[in-house]
Amino acid sequence: RGKTQDSYNAGYFIFNGDGEMTGIPYLHDYGRGSGPIGLTNTNSVGVVRDAIGEWQFKKFGSGNPIDFSFGLPTVAETWDGFLNDINGYHVKKGDVFEAIDGAVSGSLAEGNVGGGTGMMCYYFKGGTGTSSRTVEVGGKKYTVGVLVQANFGILRDLVIAGVPVGKEITDLEPVEKPQQDGSIIVVVGTDAPLSPSQLNLVAKRATLGI
């Protein structure tokens, strides 16, 4: 959640797949983002985008008839229809407002929260995960933080602490043919003074982490 309406440098990279993500044309042409970034399920992209825009307008709107406080919100999705009644369209604007207004600095809630609530990972319960590092460049320290919404993976590929545990628990394999596809969203944030083109490269490097 931004403390001001100021936009920020931004980039993106699509590694594979056909997931929906709003705001890409603006990121591509201008290399700028504005307002909160939303992560949700496939069927809730529209309501989350509209709610973020409404939140920005109410918080930063000037009252001018030509007011662009709405911005062009960035919202991405993964499909959670296996665990969630996705066609019930249960995510409402109020849920988005609550999430934005409840955002705080410091440690983040992980696992079964937010957009990650209905997600799967390596046939187990997936969700939201984070990681961060501080780096020093030219005598100055910067933070690089990563948040993922994980919804992918097949059991036999599950590795924990270097141990291929997925190959040892094959009795948990489903009876039906295993689903081969999946999805993941990676959001990287930093206070380092990077340009949009550099941030595109940062986004591309996130695929190595996957």
Please report, for each region that a protein language model flagged, where it lies by residue.
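Alpha/propeptide regions of enzymes that mature by internal proteolysis
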Residues: R1-I210
